[in-house]
From Swiss-Prot:
This is Argininosuccinate lyase. One of its GO terms (molecular function) is argininosuccinate lyase activity. It comes from Legionella pneumophila (strain Paris). Belongs to the lyase 1 family. Argininosuccinate lyase subfamily. The lineage of its organism: Bacteria, Pseudomonadati, Pseudomonadota, Gammaproteobacteria, Legionellales. InterPro entries: Arg_succ_lyase_C (IPR029419), Argininosuccinate_lyase (IPR009049), Fumarase/histidase_N (IPR024083), Fumarate_lyase_CS (IPR020557), Fumarate_lyase_fam (IPR000362), Fumarate_lyase_N (IPR022761), L-Aspartase-like (IPR008948). Its main location: cytoplasm. One of its GO terms (cellular component) is cytosol.
């Protein structure tokens, strides 16, 4: 008979290569805090429902708290262990501490609803942190919007000079984009904040569990009523990865502009020494590594989103082992976006904007062409005729190497 917790019907031990291939402890150990929180509320529920005694509940609860402290203190290694995942790891530690009483922890529970709970608690915690960091970025952009309301710069389409805009309007555009991202994150939170615990493997439990009490105790808005749905979907993971990809896309576009602006050709932005790097060969270099890395990291977040979508696309109800593949991409997505959001705000605050040069560039060239066109329209000229006329003037001004205003005044 195998020594696995599920090994009652098995006559052979699990092949060591299968055990290694099957294991997720090396990466899902980050869920230990959420796993213990869920287990402590679960065991309280078992006592409340008279399935365990109060003394049994207290013994399990206290031992779990000891395990939490020991893990935080670094007393355990998560590599080269026999336990398959963080859930079994904690349960085995519990049994080592309090004997057979520890074997009662899993009463009325499956790892299917347990891991679904842990993931919801984890993504909720990290989602709140992402929201907080996003709010800081939006506030920073609001400050830059106010500071640069009157500072003119060239606006671009197709990366060609188009019309004058305020530098403050530029920052406000990104403030609006990240504001919508925050709204998406808020909407995600409302949808995901429901408890799967009590769904069991897929069909609930015959024990008199109080799912609503557990949900309330863990800070959820309610329960996921359909037990099949509760354990079988990872749409909340996909949606968070999707929102993260959207945020990273906006960060990448912002960083692309700042990278261009920091070149000698633009010279709109001066990088702070504390947020730039040099070259191992060229002593003249001052490199924008921070925005380049943020721009680059958007690719890995996109990749994780496509990976989890692909994992989930062909799975029959309910739980399948494929769903173990949801975690590494999710964890890396969360770590990546947190790191980028923690970096972008102080980076923006460190920049010096060459507003005098921006204004000069905005007032040179032919950025006033659209305003002149519309002034002709206001005098009664048909739009297409006005467009053609201003285009002809621009061609003449280019030939004479003068501005549009100089040409018109001279005429």
């Amino acid at each position: 008979m195998t020594n696995k917790t599920w090994g009652g019907r098995f006559k052979k031990s699990l092949d060591s290569s299968v055990n290694q291939f099957n294991a997720s402890l090396s990466f899902d150990h980050v869920l230990f805090d959420q796993d213990i929180n869920g287990s402590q509320v679960h065991v309280k529920q078992l006592a409340k429902q008279k399935i365990l005694t109060e003394a049994e509940c207290q013994g399990i609860y206290s031992a779990l708290e000891e395990i939490r402290t020991e893990i935080k203190q670094g007393q355990y290694s998560f590599n080269e262990r026999d336990e398959e995942d963080i859930h079994m790891f904690i349960e085995q530690l519990l049994i080592q501490k309090i004997g057979d009483l520890g074997k009662k922890l899993h009463t009325g529970r499956s790892r299917n609803d347990q891991v679904a709970l842990d993931l919801r608690l984890y993504t909720r915690d990290k989602g709140c942190l992402i929201n907080e960091l996003l709010t800081r970025l939006i506030d920073c952009l609001d400050d830059l919007t106010s500071k640069h309301q009157q500072d003119l710069m060239p606006g671009y389409t197709h990366l060609q000079q188009a019309q004058p805009v305020a530098l403050g309007a530029y920052f406000n555009a990104y403030q609006c984009m990240f504001g919508r991202d925050k709204s998406r994150l808020d909407d995600w939170f409302k949808r995901m904040n429901y408890s799967p615990l009590g769904a069991g493997a897929l069909a609930g439990s015959t024990l008199p569990l109080d799912r609503e009490w557990v949900a309330e105790s863990l800070g959820f808005a309610g329960i996921i009523p359909n037990t099949l749905d509760a354990v079988s979907d990872r749409d909340f993971v996909i949606e968070l990865c999707s929102v993260a990809a959207m945020i990273m896309m906006h960060l990448s576009r912002l960083c692309e502009d700042l990278i261009l602006w920091s070149t000698q050709e633009f010279n709109f932005v001066i990088l702070d020494d504390a947020f730039a790097t040099g070259s191992s060969l060229m002593p003249n270099k001052k490199n924008p590594d921070v925005p380049e890395l943020i721009r680059g990291k958007s690719g890995r977040v996109y990749g994780h989103l496509m990976a989890i979508l692909t994992v989930m696309k062909g799975l029959p109800l309910a739980y399948n082992k494929d769903m173990q593949e949801d975690k590494e991409g999710l964890f890396d997505t969360i770590n990546t976006i947190i790191a980028c959001l923690q970096m972008i705000t102080p980076f923006l605050q460190s920049l010096t904007f060459n507003t005098l040069l921006m204004k000069t560039k905005a007032q040179s060239g032919y950025l006033d062409a659209t305003a002149i066109l519309e002034s002709l329209v206001m005098k009664g000229m048909p739009f297409r005729n006005a467009h053609h006329q201003v285009g002809a003037w621009i061609a003449e001004a280019i030939e004479k190497q003068c501005s549009l205003n100089e040409l018109l005044k001279g005429g």
